[in-house]
């Protein structure tokens, strides 16, 4: 699963997830899966979608993951009273704004890429759309 090798601080404030995304264009591959909604993706969700895509294209072509879970989410254990400090880091998330390209793919036909991204999108909690590279 994806997570940072090391961080300056172990825990983070909750913060807000506002604005529009940087990285809104298909940069590496020919096809992309772009977020339409706003939310957060856990490392497990990112990995599940990657596996679904890889299996769909039968390990041909190339896949790029354009998001990285760099925000720690803490949880307190069950049946523990409030107070006594912030909980332990349980998982890592990537904050997603509308317009962010999540995955890219190249080296496969468009129909196969569409099918693979459809399977991947089913694993994700946010609305997504299929995009192709625009040649200027």
Swiss-Prot record:
Q: In Gene Ontology terms, what is one molecular function of this protein?
A: structural constituent of ribosome
Check the record and name the Gene3D superfamilies matching this protein.
Ribosomal protein L10e/L16
Question: What's a GO biological-process term for it?
Answer: translation
Name the GO cellular-component terms. cytosolic large ribosomal subunit
Query: What InterPro entries would the database entry show?
Result: Ribosomal_uL16, Ribosomal_uL16_bact-type, Ribosomal_uL16_CS, Ribosomal_uL16_dom, Ribosomal_uL16_sf
Sorted UniProt keywords: Ribonucleoprotein, Ribosomal protein, RNA-binding, rRNA-binding, tRNA-binding
**Purpose:** Binds 23S rRNA and is also seen to make contacts with the A and possibly P site tRNAs.
The entry sums up its family as follows:
Belongs to the universal ribosomal protein uL16 family.
Listed under subunit, the entry gives: Part of the 50S ribosomal subunit.
Query: What is the protein named?
Result: Large ribosomal subunit protein uL16
Native organism: Salmonella arizonae (strain ATCC BAA-731 / CDC346-86 / RSK2980)
Gene name of this polypeptide: rplP
